[in-house]
């Protein structure tokens, strides 16, 4: 797996849809792919939405992601759900939206552990830091105030590097803001001004 492979897959989807250009957005891993797409296919990217994501997970990212992926192999996906839920959703959201939380957990545990390991390795290797300065399209960066997976500091770093970008910090939200506050995320993306 590589973010470049996923970005080229996204280009193929746009080709099949008959779209020459699009606003490209993604959350978490999808944000890494969106950023890579904007770098690889700048002429096709008219706007960018980077949600609860980062350009790089830092100096220890390869080891950190390898450890998480290996945990899926040794303990299984179910053993990781408690950790994941606390990163994905605020306590209040969990209490008030049990069906959404349960569905997210079901999707997570349905992952093949070996595929999850390879995805973790991909995220550990991903470093799009140098691509940030080349982003010249309207860009909205969104992060949950309590996002521990890709903290506000990571979003601020991208915001500082992408000239003209906007940064929105969602109060009391964590890592899966598209599920926690979908209307807010939709509004922000719909307001991307592509001229």
Model-derived segments and spans:
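Active-site loop/oxyanion-hole signature of alpha/beta-hydrolase fold enzymes
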Residues: 1-25, 187
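Conserved alpha/beta-hydrolase "acid-adjacent" motif
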Residues: 148-154
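Conserved alpha/beta-hydrolase catalytic His-Asp/Glu region
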Residues: 59-64, 75-134
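Gly/Ala-rich beta-loop-alpha elbow adjacent to hydrolase catalytic centers
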Residues: 26, 30, 34
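Short beta-strand/loop motif that positions the catalytic acidic residue
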Residues: 135, 141-143, 147
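Flexible "cap/lid" loop of the alpha/beta hydrolase fold
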Residues: 35-40, 44-81, 88
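Active-site-adjacent alpha-helix of alpha/beta-hydrolase-fold enzymes
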Residues: 156-165
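Catalytic active-site module of serine/aspartate enzymes centered on a nucleophile-bearing elbow/loop
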Residues: 164-195
């Amino acid at each position: 797996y590589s973010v470049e492979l996923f970005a080229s897959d996204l280009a193929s989807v746009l080709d099949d849809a008959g779209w020459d250009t699009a606003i490209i957005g993604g959350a978490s891993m999808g944000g890494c792919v969106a950023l890579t797409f904007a770098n690889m296919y700048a002429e096709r990217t008219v706007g960018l939405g980077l949600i609860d994501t980062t350009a790089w997970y830092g100096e220890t990212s390869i080891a950190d992601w390898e450890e998480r992926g290996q945990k899926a192999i040794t303990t299984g996906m179910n053993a990781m759900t408690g950790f994941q839920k606390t990163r994905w959703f605020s306590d209040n959201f969990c209490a008030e939206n049990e069906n959404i939380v349960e569905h997210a957990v079901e999707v997570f545990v349905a992952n093949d552990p070996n595929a999850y390991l390879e995805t973790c390795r991909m995220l550990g290797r991903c470093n799009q830091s140098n691509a940030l300065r080349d982003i010249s399209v309207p860009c909205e960066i969104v992060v949950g105030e309590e996002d521990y997976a890709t903290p506000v500091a990571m979003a601020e770093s991208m915001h500082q590097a992408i000239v003209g970008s906007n940064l929105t910090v969602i109060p009391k939200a964590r890592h899966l803001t598209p599920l926690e506050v979908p209307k807010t995320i939709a509004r922000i993306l719909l307001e991307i001004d592509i001229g």
